From Swiss-Prot:
Belongs to the RemA family. Signal peptide: none annotated. InterPro entries: RemA-like. It comes from the Bacteria. Pfam families: RemA-like (PF04025). This is Putative regulatory protein GK1166.
Length: 87
């Protein structure tokens, strides 16, 4: 079985099979999740000093910050044909 990796920006990759959710960092609950992950040592900052645009939560409780839009990460995960934003 081959493992699929998703590019989350600047050459950083995460395992597609381990992603639970991809969300925007703007809401207060997500900001609390980021702070809790920082305090517990489970925060991975992959932004290279740029603005955080997506927060990726992994099945290992790690929280990954990315400067790529959540929609872009989702399109890379599911392919542009399989993903459609409903709202």
């Amino acid at each position: 079985m081959m493992m699929k990796f998703i590019n989350i920006g600047y050459g950083n990759m995460v395992s597609a099979a381990r992603i639970i959710t991809i969300v925007s960092p703007d809401s207060a609950p997500i900001k609390r999740i980021i702070q809790d992950a920082r305090e517990s040592g489970k925060l991975v900052d992959a932004t290279h000093g740029r603005r955080t645009r997506a927060v990726i939560i992994m099945d290992s409780d790690h929280v990954i910050l990315s400067s790529v839009q959540p929609e872009t990460v989702a399109n890379r995960l599911y392919g542009s044909d399989d993903f459609s934003e409903e709202g």
